[in-house]
Amino acid sequence: MMTIEKAMRTLRLPNPTTPEDLESRWSKVLTFGDRILLAGYYYNGIGQPSYFGAVYEHLDDDLSCEGTIGLRAVSEVEFEDDGHAIAWAIQQ
């Protein structure tokens, strides 16, 4: 698993943010219970896995798209597709 600080710097993941902001920046964002899951793409070289998963959690009582969320877990860039990245995020 990647550290939060490294993910923010390398993958340019915002922290804190809102679900609305994530959805405008990334194409694969899902609400899953009280968590927000993200599958992201980061070019890792020809023939290399280029997808990662990330998990955000609500930081306040506002569960709308404008509530504040914080980054809780990020995988390494290790998946060959976004489905496997989301599967990783679900298991966190």
Where are these regions (language model features)?
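Generic "edge-of-domain/loop-turn" microfeature
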Residues: 18, 60-62, 84
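A short, exposed loop/beta-hairpin motif centered on an aromatic-Gly-Thr core
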Residues: 66-82
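Negatively charged, low-complexity tracts enriched in Asp/Glu with abundant Ser/Thr
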Residues: 1-35
